[in-house]
């Protein structure tokens, strides 16, 4: 079978590899659509913290697929079902896992980082992490469950009030998902501070009412920072109402420092929250939104490539003009 393997330092190859053999507690799945994102670029170019990846690694952590083989028949999932799979594989025994914070598992593994990902014709996964998606859910929406769950985790933590005025900073996939998902909390306003005017079309589809490329006037109850731009983080402190919340989802870089006016934070009684990954509960909540029909993310996949065209996909990820949403590999059916 073919797998897209990263060796780090810019080296990535489409290789013929031996198909995986599953254990009784695993399933074999044929990926249908696999997204690629900025984190995959960091893996390819070795810009990610080496503690989070094991080379060589088959990339691909945003995906949906169809079940080919089930290790144990004692499951609701059947061969032929279309599924999504939690990427974080928790140990299930540490104090974080026992508390339900599986995103903070002490010894977790992760699909596409420390074990083979879904930019491949076949992938084996733990059966306990597999979730069926209904026929009404598009492949595009299903593929975005992973990044959407990252956003769900953060929004659940921030707990915006009904009628809140919200600003999303950034115009990439995470920012667009944040704008769309936060709508389920019934805010009065969702604005976006982006970098490219060409992203306006996607922002509007996500439910954004006003799109800015320069710092907007006025103040917000909740600001979701999804750009990773350190300068935006500093500016956002002064854009919050007293008692407001700043939610950090973006990554400026492991060696990037961000200056903050602590006096402004304390005097305004602000809350600064960070959110990493997703827990099992956030994943289940996101899948439930899709299966219920309350969430449709089809609009976000804008570029598709065959796995053999991986070089073109990587180039598009680095430099495709706006509007640009999710870039994905079409692998199976």
Task: Please provide the spans of the model-predicted regions.
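C-terminal hydrophobic helical "lid"/dimerization subdomain
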Residues: 1, 280-333
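Glycine-rich beta-strand-centered segment in the early N-terminal region that forms part
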Residues: 20-34, 48-95, 134-136
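NAD(P)H dinucleotide-binding glycine-rich loop of Rossmann-like/cofactor-binding domains
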Residues: 91-169
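Mid-domain Rossmann-like dinucleotide-binding core that forms the NAD(H)/NADP(H) cofactor-binding site
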Residues: 137-213
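N-terminal Rossmann-fold cofactor-binding loop
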Residues: 193-196, 226, 276
């Amino acid at each position: 079978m073919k797998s897209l393997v990263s060796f780090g330092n810019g080296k990535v190859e489409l290789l013929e590899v031996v198909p995986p053999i599953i254990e009784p507690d695993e399933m074999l799945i044929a990926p249908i659509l696999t997204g690629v994102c900025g984190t995959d670029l960091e893996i390819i170019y070795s810009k990610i913290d080496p503690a989070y990846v094991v080379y060589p690694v088959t990339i691909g952590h945003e995906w949906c697929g169809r079940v080919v083989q089930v290790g144990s028949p004692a499951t609701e999932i059947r061969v032929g079902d279309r599924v999504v799979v939690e990427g974080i594989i928790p140990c299930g025994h540490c104090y974080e896992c026992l508390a339900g914070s599986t995103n903070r598992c002490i010894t977790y593994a992760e699909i596409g980082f420390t074990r083979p990902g879904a930019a491949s014709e076949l992938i084996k996964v733990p059966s306990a992490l597999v979730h069926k998606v209904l026929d009404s859910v598009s492949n595009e929406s299903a593929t975005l469950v992973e990044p959407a769950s990252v956003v769900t985790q953060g929004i659940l933590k921030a707990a915006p009030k009904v009628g809140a005025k919200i600003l999303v900073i950034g115009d990439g996939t995470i920012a667009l998902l944040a704008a769309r998902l936060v709508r389920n909390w019934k805010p009065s306003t969702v604005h976006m501070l982006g970098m490219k005017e060409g992203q306006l079309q996607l922002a509007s589809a996500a439910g954004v009412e006003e799109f800015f490329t320069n710092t907007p006037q006025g103040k917000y109850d909740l600001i979701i920072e999804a750009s990773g731009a350190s300068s935006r983080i500093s500016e956002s402190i002064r854009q919050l109402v007293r008692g407001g919340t700043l939610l950090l989802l973006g990554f400026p870089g492991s060696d990037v420092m961000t200056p903050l006016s602590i006096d402004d934070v304390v005097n305004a009684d602000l809350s600064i929250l960070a959110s990493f990954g997703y827990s099992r509960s956030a994943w289940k909540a996101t899948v439930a939104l899709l299966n219920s029909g309350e969430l449709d993310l089809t609009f976000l996949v804008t570029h598709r490539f065959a796995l053999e065209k991986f070089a073109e996909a990587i180039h598009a990820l680095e430099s495709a003009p706006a509007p640009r949403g999710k870039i994905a590999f079409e692998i199976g059916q």
